Amino acid sequence: RQMCIRDSFIAEGVDQTRGWFFTLHAIATMVFDSVAYKNVISNGLVLDKNGNKMSKRLGNAVDPFGAIEQYGSDPLRWYMITNSSPWDNLKFDTDGVMEVTRKFFGTLHNTYKFFAPYANLDGFTYQEADVPMSKRPEIDRWILSELNSLIKNVDMCYADYEPTKAGRLINDFVNDNLSNWYVRLCR
């Protein structure tokens, strides 16, 4: 028999290593004489901000639906992926989520607010032909070069299962290169 592997990896909590991971491999070996998946991504645990296991009984658990309602799903995801590598335990702190919302998403929002009025004034519609690189100002060539380097490096991080490094590279690009340099010098 031939087994169809739909995904090349499985991601589960570190507490599932002996149970779920092993069971899937044992079944696949017995039934299909093959492995169940090619790679394992073992997620760490989400702990409270002091490094303790979250528990309703202790009152230190965070309601995920309440957190999504309060902060939004994108800031929560971004905080969790850029705060620590997925295989490490994450000390969850709502102050960190607020900081991500302000520093990363606020910067993205403000960058767009800088761009939008000028684009609207010029009648920009995303349908225009590309401006040849040689006809662009030096600052535009610089940010596009930085963007292309970012894309290459983020792709390499993802290929190496390093989403935290990828997220931090994006963070640095948005906060440093795009906002602090490009937007400020273009004003």
Regions found by a protein language model. Name each.
Residues R6-Q16:
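A short glycine/serine-rich beta->alpha loop
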Residues I10-A11, W20-F21, L76-R77:
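Short hydrophobic-aromatic micro-motifs
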Residues T17-D33:
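Metal-dependent nuclease catalytic cores in nucleic-acid-processing enzymes
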